[in-house]
Amino acid sequence: MLLAIDSGNTNIVFAVYDGDTLRGEWRASTDSERTADELGVWLTQLLTIEGLNRLDISAAIIASVVPAMVFGLKTLCRRYFKCEPLVVGDEGVDLGLSILLDRPEEVGADRLVNAVAAHKYYKGPLIVIDFGTATTFDVVDADGNYCGGAISPGINLSLEALHMAAAKLPRVAIGRPRQVIGRATVPAMQSGIFWGYVGLIEGLVKRIKEEFGSDMLVLATGGLAPLFAEATKVINALDADLTLRGLLEIHRRNSTPVRG
């Protein structure tokens, strides 16, 4: 079985695949102070609850946008699963796509993994919107090349910034307001963020298509993707497991060392 690890700025997602079958998926908060042993004991217990044996995991792959997490996650794989993990972005790891950027080394691993999965399962040209700590818009052409994109602050990050920077604005949860014109502070904040982001999505998608010069499939992933897909017609498809499926595909493209 394969252990796929998606380490983001806010959460780490651990998933176990048996072939194409997703056997389990768990989340932990991203914390570079947490040791490999803490994560290992926690994950081993969750595997046991699902009826899985950690020793049946023979390979692992890691994508991380937090460099400080990589060492601990590699140690976790070696110590608890007796395997040397592939790390997206390491030299020699074949993604199966060309990165058509001036500085390809700067692209986040999660964005590249999403591009791999999007091209594999949906073809192109397409736009991938990932609603995470940042909201990213990534362009993949019909040949599977990664062409770049746009990065904006994530929804929850924007809400937190409002609360932290303005003394009288409270911390609020994201939600779809019943109306655009808020009649109190909280609904006004929710309206500004929610409908503002709908406008952001629609505006960027329109401009990307115009610049790219063709119609494109728009695919959304991330926890808030369903909420925004209901509010705009520009999103054509949702895929909650896009990043994990991208990790699975990259693992298949690369020879994985035999467990020691």
Swiss-Prot record:
InterPro entries: ATPase_NBD, Type_III_PanK. A monovalent cation. Ammonium or potassium. Its cofactor is NH4(+); K(+). It is found in: Cytoplasm. It catalyses: (R)-pantothenate + ATP = (R)-4'-phosphopantothenate + ADP + H(+). GO terms for cellular component: cytoplasm. It is an enzyme of class 2 (transferase). ATP binds at D6, S7, G8, N9, T10, N11, I12, V13, T133. Substrate binds at G108, A109, D110, R111, T185. Belongs to the type III pantothenate kinase family. Catalyzes the phosphorylation of pantothenate (Pan), the first step in CoA biosynthesis. Homodimer. This is Type III pantothenate kinase. The gene is coaX.
